[in-house]
Amino acid sequence: QEGKINYMPTNDELLEGFQNSRLVNKQTLGIIYMLESKIRDRARHSTALLGMSNYSLEHIMPKKWPNNWPACASEEDRIKRNRKLLTLGNLAIITSSLNSSIRDANWNDKRNGKGNKHGLRHFAAGLETLSDSYLNKDVWDESIIDERAVFLFNKAKDIWNL
């Protein structure tokens, strides 16, 4: 078709997108769900992946991070952190929305829960896109967000032979 452009991004462009593109929730949910559906180790899981509408999108570092997360050293660092909040490395699908008291909690409470409120570890159990290798991190910061973005990028590259 005349005027139709078929363009495949380079690996560098795709990695840039995984690390720095700020996406709307529906886009991110779809991308992470598709990755999960392709990398899921069916031999390890007794349950099937649920339909996409059964998952909630969670900001691992919350949008309201200043309330309970470590402060940034400078205004420039704060701006960089805020830019990372909506990137793929900081977003995850989970089986249920977190309770509001946990959603904006510090990293330890957010991942493990507090009292009778479950955290990410509970609601992400069995999901390869937010595995224990990330939930066991002592901190969740911009470097870990970038690390996870690279992990997701590499999975996408392997799946779609990019």
Predicted regions and their residues:
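Intrinsically disordered, low-complexity N-proximal targeting/linker segments that flank membranes
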Residues: 1-84, 88, 93
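Long, cytosolic, alpha-helical-rich C-terminal regions that act as interaction/scaffolding modules
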Residues: 83-87, 91-162
